[in-house]
From Swiss-Prot:
Mg(2+) binds at residues 102, 241, 243, 245. It catalyses: alpha-D-glucosamine 1-phosphate = D-glucosamine 6-phosphate. Pfam families: PGM_PMM_I, PGM_PMM_II, PGM_PMM_III, PGM_PMM_IV. NCBIfam families: glmM, PRK10887.1. The gene is glmM. It comes from Legionella pneumophila subsp. pneumophila (strain Philadelphia 1 / ATCC 33152 / DSM 7513). This is Phosphoglucosamine mutase. The keyword Transferase does not apply. The keyword Isomerase applies. Catalyzes the conversion of glucosamine-6-phosphate to glucosamine-1-phosphate.
Length: 455
């Protein structure tokens, strides 16, 4: 596959004004997308965004570029990423565009795309867009310019969809829920979803001002959520990120419930009901405790590369339905086409009601292993990861762990680092073993550097 110039694993992202996330580039990006999609026929694209102040500017730029290519635009306004994927399908659009930098702070923003079926754009389409970006922008004749309309009931449509993902007779009437919307795209949606299903909802992070998205709130900063759950005596806390595709939970005792535990709860329930349809997909960074808990049920477990894109790819390859990441990207392919924080939370709430169990009871079957991650500075990360002496050192440690732990080496894709991760039953021993392994690798790195010809 050709090397991408602009697209990363999840669209195009950067610091606003100091990267390609600027009005000039984004206008041309909209035009390029329009040209690739249109291919001579009238097409329609939906655009949604989170609550960053830069979203207004980027939305206008995209709209102008798409119009110049003769593509009609439907503006959704603030809308969670999975909501945009859903509405792309129901509005019969040819593509959906998300303006968001997910869990990042307001200074960043990004553009990512969904195809007509609500899935990620194929690599071939992304490469065609990049090729079009290299051409001179040409506006279609005035009679063929695209029009823009605003979908005023977009939030209501998505709220109804979310509610439809649990059994129609499910009621959350006996649950008190704190929901943290991260001052992001779910601020006007998530509280309504849960309250319309009967829950007593205490919402926080619902006052976006363009600058406070993900700021000391949401799934990446759950301290406020935890405090609120304890303070109001809630049954559960739900922490979403700025664009609503991640979720973490807090139980009534104040314990954090991460993506691995959420995957376990959902997968175990489906397995017990005979509707799991295959196995479960995690990533290279999923806790070994998840693998042990899933396989102990007699359910296959597969690891993908890190990133929800790769989780989705593996699920589709195997025709499985449930997967996700520790960070809270949870994919239920029998319900949605992408990670959806609200939908994942609803699955857990439905299980709590159906089994009449508290969240801490549902997590009792999975024991997360202590994990130590060390970032080892080196200019030889990739060489070290494949070095025979390093591989042997890893094997020796894995033998010592005796099937009750895991070792993972990952060269960083952006920094001169080798990430060394060790998991095991005892936290202090794991920390010690990780440091010993890093010391061994550092010695090998030193010898390797000395043997390399000087430049």
């Amino acid at each position: 596959m050709s090397q991408r110039k602009y697209f990363g694993t999840d669209g195009i992202r950067g610091h606003v004004g100091l990267s390609n996330i600027n009005p000039e580039f984004v206008l041309k990006l909209g035009w390029a997308v329009g040209c690739v999609l249109a291919n001579g026929a009238r097409k329609k694209v939906v655009i949604g965004k989170d609550t960053r102040v830069s979203g207004y500017m980027l939305e206008s730029a995209l709209e102008a570029g798409l119009s110049a290519a003769g593509v009609d635009v439907a503006l959704l306004g603030p809308m969670p990423t999975p909501g945009i994927a859903y509405l792309t399908q129901t509005l019969r659009a040819n593509a959906g565009i998300v303006i968001s930098a997910s869990h990042n702070l307001f200074e960043d923003n990004g553009i990512k795309f969904f195809s007509a079926d609500g899935g990620k754009l194929p690599d071939s389409v992304e490469l065609a867009i990049e090729a079009q970006l290299e051409k001179q922008l040409q506006t279609v004749p005035s009679a063929k310019l695209g029009k823009a309309t605003r979908i005023n009931d977009a939030a209501g449509r998505y709220i109804e969809f979310c509610k439809s993902t649990i059994p129609s007779l499910s009621r959350l009437s006996n649950l008190k829920i704190v929901v943290d919307c991260a001052n992001g795209a779910t601020y006007h949606i998530a509280p309504n979803v849960f309250s319309e299903l009967g829950a007593d909802v205490v919402p926080i992070g619902i006052k976006p001002d363009g600058f406070n998205i993900n700021q000391e709130c949401g799934s990446t900063a759950p301290e406020l959520l935890r405090e609120k759950v304890i303070a109001v005596g809630a049954d559960i806390g739900i922490g979403l990120d700025g664009d609503g595709d991640r979720v973490i939970l807090v139980d009534s005792l104040g314990n954090l419930v991460d993506g691995d535990q959420i995957i376990y709860i959902i997968a175990k329930d489906r397995h017990q009901r005979g509707v799991l349809h295959g196995g479960v997909v995690g990533t290279l960074m999923s806790n070994y405790g998840l693998e042990l808990a899933i396989t102990s049920l007699g359910v296959p477990f597969q690891r993908s590369k890190v990133g929800d894109r790769y989780v989705l790819e593996t699920l589709r390859e195997k025709d499985w339905k449930i997967g996700g990441e520790t960070s809270g990207h949870i994919v239920c392919l029998d319900k949605t086409t992408t990670g959806d924080g609200i939908v994942a939370a609803l699955q857990v709430l439905s299980i709590m009601v159906k089994q009449n169990k508290a969240l801490h009871e549902l997590t009792a079957g999975i024991q997360l292993l202590p994990q130590t991650l060390v970032n080892l500075k080196t200019n030889n990360a990739a060489l070290l990861a494949s070095n025979p002496d390093v591989i042997q050192a890893v094997k020796n440690l894995e033998k010592h762990l005796n099937g009750e732990g895991r070792v993972l080496l990952r060269p960083s894709g952006t920094e001169p680092l080798l990430r060394v991760m060790v998991e095991g039953a005892n936290a202090s021993i794991v920390k010690q073993q990780a440091q010993m392994l890093c010391d061994d690798i550092s010695q090998i790195d030193k010898k390797m550097t000395e043997s390399l010809p000087s430049t």
